[in-house]
Amino acid sequence: MSIDTAERYRRALETRDVELALSAFAPDAVVRSPLTSRVRFTGHAELRPLLEVAYSHLRDVRFHTDTGDEATRVVVYTARIGGEEIEEAAVLKLGEDGLIAEVTLFVRPLPGLVALMDAFGPDIARRNGRTFAARLLAVAAKPLLAMVRSGDKRAVPLAGPRR
C-alpha cells in the first residue's frame, strides 16, 4: 500500500496534479517546511495552496530514489526552480490507512533552497491572504539570494580540494 501512495505522490509532482497529490495525503496530514521548523502546513485546506504554488514553480522534475517500507518512504528528485537546480528529499511517514500522515522536506544546494524561498514565499503568503507579507517576502529574499549565489560561485569553491 505504501508503494502505491509514494507512486501517487511522485506522479502528482511529475504531472502537477494537485488532486492526485491530495489523494495521497491523510485529511489531517502535516508538511514540514525545508526552510524552518517554525512553518508547517496541516490538512488539505493548507496543503492545496502549497501544492499549487510548488507545482507552478518546479520544472524538469526527475525522481531518482524511492525507498522504505510500509511505515516510511523516502523519495528523492531533482528539479529546477527559476535558474537553479535543486534536489529534494521527502520523508513520507504513512498512517495505518497507507496515506501520508507527515512529510518532512530537505532541499539542497543552498542557492536552490533560497530560490525556492524567493519563489514560494510571496506566492504562499498571497494565497493565504497576507498581501503585506507577500510584498515583504518578495523584497527580503532578493539580497539573500544574490549573496548565496555569489558565495556559492566564488567563496565555497575556495574550501574544496585543489584540482
Where are these regions (language model features)?
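C-terminal and inter-domain tail/linker signature
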Residues: 1-163
